[in-house]
Amino acid sequence: MSNSQWVPVSLNEYLAHLPMSDEQRAELASCTTFAELHERLSAQPVTDPAEAAQASVGRRLTLSADDLEDAEMLGVDASGRLCLKATPPIRRTKVVPEPWRTNILVRGWRRLTGKSNPPKPDHSDLPRDLPKSRWRTVGSIRRYILLILMLGQTIVAGSYMKGILPYQGWSLVSLDEITRQTFVQTALQVLPYALQTSILLLFGILFCWVSAGFWTALMGFLELLTGRDKYRISGASAGNEPIEAGARTALVMPICNEDVPRVFAGLRATFESVAATGNLDRFDFFVLSDTNETDIAVAEQQAWLDVCRETKGFGSIFYRRRRRRVKRKSGNLDDFCRRWGGEYRYMVVLDADSVMSGECLTSLVRLMEATPDAGIIQTAPRASGMDTLYARMQQFATRVYGPLFTAGLHFWQLGESHYWGHNAIIRMKPFIEHCALAPLPGKGAFAGAILSHDFVEAALMRRAGWGVWIAYDLPGSYEELPPNLLDELKRDRRWCHGNLMNFRLFLVKGMHPVHRAVFLTGVMSYLSAPLWFFFLVLSTALLAVNTLMEPTYFLEPRQLYPLWPQWHPERAVALFSTTIVLLFLPKLLSVILIWAKGAKGFGGKFKVTVSMLLEMLFSVLLAPVRMLFHTRFVLAAFLGWAATWNSPQRDDDSTPWLEAVKRHGPQTLLGACWALLVFWLNPSFLWWLAPIVVSLMLSIPVSVISSRTNLGLKARDEKFFLIPEEFEPPQELVSTDQYTHENRWHALKQGFIRAVVDPRQNALACALATSRHRQAQPIEVVRMERVDHALKVGPAKLDNQHRLMLLSDPVALGRLHERVWSEGHEEWLAAWRASIEADPHAPLLPLQPVVKAPEPVLV
């Protein structure tokens, strides 16, 4: 009788999923138990059958990836269990955040009572031989000029606005008369003037905000047109200096439940681009995962192994998944700095969708070396890679208008600029010493871990005496935008809450005035929405007062002449025209700049102009929609409402009609009711409000139609909303697109079930598990309970928290794997088989070992 006639079917099935020769498989088929199989695979005696699967992890790994041994990636932990060297050895550096003192009254009281306040920033780590930079004086002068321009423009516009409003001044309200009349009579008399004053105040704030954007774009236009910016940071380096061996740079990519195929495609494209520069030995790559979805976590493990094997990046590309997700992204970076930050001079932070060229990265290192007082150099990422109509219009807008605003920011701020949290290089030593973030004190929605960490880190870097620059003209930095309006708004809600939190730091001691202004502009980015909304509501209320209240023309006894409400339509037209110019002239200047520099990459002069006009129309339609959403976000933040919004997963990134109705339905209803109210009050006023109410009533179809991929691709085919990165794509983006498609082709589905049952996936998961405790009875009891619970409830009912604990524990995961097979738990085995059958790209069985082609012999 042959062995195949008596060996359990599950054992043959297990062997079929190990890549080995038929001879090896036949030899192992004589095993009578799975414990014996694992013992023979490991080629060492196993004293405890429960630990048999753990003993064979190394052999199962090398059968699937024999280059792990060649790269010396296999190691053992303190308990002698096999592990993968997915991270470098830990060399800890002290990272101590300074507690925030946000209350100026408390600081003043501590000073009066002699209690110590935080010490002044220590600039001893700055290079001593640097002369005082002239750019600091120039920057201060420029910002005073900007302030004068903004305030002067706002005062003139405010005087025009005051002349437009019907009730001129409060002089017609008699205080003596107010004391002799009822409260209702007083309220009715004062109401028009109170409304008018509020409208004037809101107009001044909003006009000043628009004016700041206009002057920023105008100076950016002049900078880019002339090309004579002697303070641009990119001019500090010739661009061909050798990078010294000590200037090591870590590229860190914090991720959390991201699109795994796209993340590792961009990482691979960036890695290969750096390798092409010949400076790969100066860079290390870190994927820092905060993922808490087990299927995604297992897919990340496999993707890391695949990209290391494909690029021969073992020892250069590292992967770590945190078990304790403290302080979100900033905490993830803190953990990296604490463990490995001292080994690197610089750090480049990447987003999950970031791609950077090797030339850009090496240029950033050279700029840091050439500018010893620079703490952060931020690039201007170019948006690309999206196909929906909405995303294509947005990436066209950022590509066409963005350079003006970025160059303008640099003109006004110079070395006291923004940091956007990604696609930037950071000097590690001052970042570790000065930029660790303590949680905000207190309770409520604006306390706790800082959400928008980037602005705060830039402010702390500048407070410590280091420069923060924008390299606005440095090419080779790319990112992706949300595919549709609702995904963008979901991101905006997080940013809104984070920027409102940051404003608590506005009066923190030692902050530079520029970064106090950055906190203020961050708040105004979202607070301007409710201010605009209230401005429109008050304007409608003033219209109602003028329409419904009987005007009083004679306010004093024996008054000879009536006092008529004043209307100056010519001033209204002039003010309206001026506002339109401030809003849309930067877009026209952007297109003029493209005409002057060359419009071929944008589809030609005609196509780029038509694209600009279409984008302007689209922005007009979406501005009121964003206004209402941002108003809701601001109110939600102040009221402490939960900031979660779980949109359904969509493969084509399009918005379903049902979801659009759910999200935009109240806006549509508000727009219709508002239009009816204004029409009833004064039909002629409806023309002024039409852009608002029509946009709200069209929000549902606009949101759905703009999210369609086929419309975006058709627009690209017709060369509308075309950008140079599509007309002549750089190699990094071509590679990213190629690798994304390849990764999606063999992307791992239902990863946790594979990690439990599949012989190869289980070996990888056990080798990468990070919860490596020493032997202890309480831990053993917990492990046994977790394994028993998983076997009892099965994969369908096992919650994500239990899955995470199993995935993090190599011993528990190995025991679960062994018991599923040896005890024949059909629920787990059936789920695993179903996952393989559902995968159209699963390999044929039985698996055969990879045969390496013989290397050519050089003669």
From Swiss-Prot:
UniProt topology in membrane: Multi-pass membrane protein
Coiled coil regions, renumbered to chain: none
Gene Ontology CC terms: plasma membrane
Keyword match Glycosyltransferase: yes
Highest taxon listed in the record's lineage: Bacteria
Top-tier EC class: transferase
EC number in record: 2.4.1.-
Protein role: Involved in the biosynthesis of osmoregulated periplasmic glucans (OPGs).
The encoding gene: opgH
SUPFAM superfamilies assigned to the protein according to its UniProt record, in alphabetical order: Nucleotide-diphospho-sugar transferases (SSF53448)
InterPro entries referenced in this protein's UniProt entry, alphabetically: Glucans_biosynth_gluTrFase_H, Glyco_trans_2-like, Glycosyltr_2/OpgH_subfam, Nucleotide-diphossugar_trans
UniProt similarity note: Belongs to the glycosyltransferase 2 family. OpgH subfamily.
Pathway(s) where this gene product acts: Glycan metabolism; osmoregulated periplasmic glucan (OPG) biosynthesis
One Pfam family here: Glycos_transf_2
One GO biological process term: glucan biosynthetic process
Transmembrane segments: 144-166, 200-222, 523-545, 573-595, 608-630, 684-706
UniProt-recorded name of the protein: Glucans biosynthesis glucosyltransferase H
GO molecular function, one term: hexosyltransferase activity
Listed Gene3D superfamilies: Spore Coat Polysaccharide Biosynthesis Protein SpsA, Chain A (3.90.550.10)
Keywords: Cell inner membrane, Cell membrane, Glycosyltransferase, Membrane, Transferase, Transmembrane, Transmembrane helix
Location of the protein in the cell: Cell inner membrane
